[in-house]
Design a protein with these regions (language model features):
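Acidic/aromatic/glycine-rich contiguous surface patches that form carbohydrate-binding/processing clefts
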Residues: 191
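Extended intrinsically disordered or low-complexity regions, especially N/C-terminal cytosolic tails and loops
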Residues: 1-183, 195-275
Length: 275
């Protein structure tokens, strides 16, 4: 590997760490990679550009996932409250199938309530005698993973179906896609590498798609597939979203990045989902 500015390289290594950067060096090694010899023309600058690309990709994904989180929380609260007629339905065991899962959710809810410093929660505690706040308050303080677990445990199938349908999906794929989004979100939050990662969750596919989707063979464990799921949600939540524009600008800034490493198939831009 060519290092043109040794002082700058030492600076980056001391603030980022060799182990973290090594994940971006690995794809640039010659085969067999066990020899730890870099391909011809590899520079430390190229490693850093790949690192920056991944960072900007995480920021892009997190920004789009945030919109999905807000919309999903809202749908679960609105449909759950409307169809049960109970503002406190999230903490009522009668509304859930699995008592053990419900108890775990209650434990997590209580933990959040005990540690939160949100003014609206403190105001509720001081003003009302109810043991728990209504569902629309709880969803503001609960982690997204807890919200998805609450959804998966809802007993009333009509409620689950109504929520899933509002996002153009059947119940099983909706639950699965929420899990995929949660895993991707957590990777972004924890600054994990995402650009060429092989994710562990294989998404459940709908029997039929009511909206434009992808047709080309695609690796469901690569980040491109996660991006397709994100785009599906965004097209419902915000039909005029600019996710594709952001992606194209990112790739234009880093033209050397191999899209195939992210799982992008040749001709992806012509897929119905991306039109």
């Amino acid at each position: 590997m060519e290092i043109t500015d040794e002082e700058k390289a030492v600076h980056y290594l001391s603030h980022i760490g060799y182990y973290r950067l090594s994940a971006y060096m690995y794809p640039l090694l010659s085969i067999p990679k066990e020899q730890h010899l870099f391909k011809q023309g590899v520079t430390f600058g190229k490693v850093m550009r790949l690192y920056r690309f991944d960072k900007k990709l995480r920021l892009l994904l997190f920004n789009e996932i945030e919109k999905i989180e807000v919309a999903v929380r809202c749908a679960i609260v609105n449909f759950g409250t409307e169809m049960t007629g109970n503002p406190f339905w999230m903490t009522d065991a009668n509304n859930f199938s699995n008592p053990s899962k419900f108890n775990r959710s209650i434990h997590l809810i209580e933990d959040e309530l005990n540690h939160t410093k949100e003014d609206f929660i403190n105001h509720f505690k001081e003003t009302y005698t109810n043991q728990y706040p209504p569902s629309w308050m709880l969803t503001e303080i609960l982690p997204f993973g807890v919200i998805t677990n609450i959804y998966s445990n809802i007993k009333n199938k009509k409620i689950k179906k109504r929520i899933a349908q509002s996002f153009g999906l059947q119940v099983a794929p909706f639950e699965s896609w929420l899990t995929v989004i949660t895993v991707t979100r957590n990777s972004c939050c924890h600054h994990a590498r995402v650009w060429n990662r092989i994710f562990s969750i294989r998404a459940t596919m709908p029997i039929r798609m009511s909206r434009p989707w992808i047709t080309l063979p695609t690796d469901p464990l690569k980040v491109y597939f996660d991006m397709c799921i994100i785009k599906h949600f965004l097209d419902i939540i915000s039909p005029n979203n600019d996710m594709l524009d952001k992606m194209n600008r990112l790739f234009a800034t880093f033209p050397e990045v191999d899209k195939a490493a992210l799982g992008f198939p040749s001709g992806w831009e012509n897929e119905p989902l991306w039109q």
